[in-house]
Amino acid sequence: MPELPEVETVRRGLNRLVSGATIASIEVFWPKIINNDVDSFKQRLANQTIQTIDRRGKYLLFRFSNGLTMVSHLRMEGKYNVVPRGEDQGKHTHVIFHLTDDRDLLYNDTRKFGRMTLVPTGEENTVAGLRTIGPEPVAEQLTLAYMTATFGKSKKMIKPLLLDQSKIAGIGNIYADETLWMSKIHPMRPANSLTTDEIATLRQNIIDEMAMAIKGHGTTVHSFSTAFGEAGQFQNHLHVYGREGEPCERCGTIIEKIKVAQRGTHFCPLEQRL
């Protein structure tokens, strides 16, 4: 699943490609992707201009000229790309936004898990997932006081807590493993067992790692690609995720992979101890 850095990379690319573009018409080939009535969805966006594209956590927010916002969740495999009108759309394209400048904005999703929801701008929090979403992993929102209070009252293991979008927005499996390794914290540690210093270190590593991953245009492990159809580059800078059986960069101990809350989890057994 694309995590915050990947979704932010897509957002930036789409803003360069389609901000200011006007939708002529829409074709929907897999209606379940649309959470609204499909005919109404198509009618309400026809002849509307994409003013900008914002992001909240892992959700893209397409802002339209008529005061509507399309909340797009890519889920596991969703991706957007822009092609000239008439170009082969591919067998996994499920929604096409025909633009008035003879281009098509394609939504492609091999798993068909992605969802689009049209709401009045300002009412994005009525969409499931956004209703309870936590702060963004940036210094201004993810404060030490917030993290200390949140972790202090939870006996939950630290990794699944980091994956809980109601606690912190945008962290997924890759960046949870990476930031816990950077912080030398075992993924199964109870959140309330972390010291203030450990929380402060983890917080800073989350903020720094997400910023660096965005700068690296996200991580391509399976199929992620940018709005320009290019792979991300940050997979070349991962320290622990996907490196089971390889030596830890810091101490040389072999990286192990275990299941934590049903998620494959990579860690250094020497430096990340329970």
UniProtKB/Swiss-Prot annotation:
A zinc finger (FPG-type) spans 239-273. It comes from the Bacteria. One of its GO terms (molecular function) is damaged DNA binding. DNA binds at residues 92, 111. It catalyses: Hydrolysis of DNA containing ring-opened 7-methylguanine residues, releasing 2,6-diamino-4-hydroxy-5-(N-methyl)formamidopyrimidine; 2'-deoxyribonucleotide-(2'-deoxyribose 5'-phosphate)-2'-deoxyribonucleotide-DNA = a 3'-end 2'-deoxyribonucleotide-(2,3-dehydro-2,3-deoxyribose 5'-phosphate)-DNA + a 5'-end 5'-phospho-2'-deoxyribonucleoside-DNA + H(+). One of its GO terms (biological process) is base-excision repair. The keyword Glycosyltransferase does not apply. The active site is at residues 2-3, 58, 263. Its cofactor is Zn(2+). Pfam families: Fapy_DNA_glyco (PF01149), H2TH (PF06831), zf-FPG_IleRS (PF06827). Binds 1 zinc ion per subunit. Coiled coil: none annotated. Monomer. Belongs to the FPG family. Involved in base excision repair of DNA damaged by oxidation or by mutagenic agents. Acts as a DNA glycosylase that recognizes and removes damaged bases. Has a preference for oxidized purines, such as 7,8-dihydro-8-oxoguanine (8-oxoG). Has AP (apurinic/apyrimidinic) lyase activity and introduces nicks in the DNA strand. Cleaves the DNA backbone by beta-delta elimination to generate a single-strand break at the site of the removed base with both 3'- and 5'-phosphates. NCBIfam families: fpg (TIGR00577), PRK01103.1 (NF002211). This is Formamidopyrimidine-DNA glycosylase. It comes from Lactiplantibacillus plantarum (strain ATCC BAA-793 / NCIMB 8826 / WCFS1).
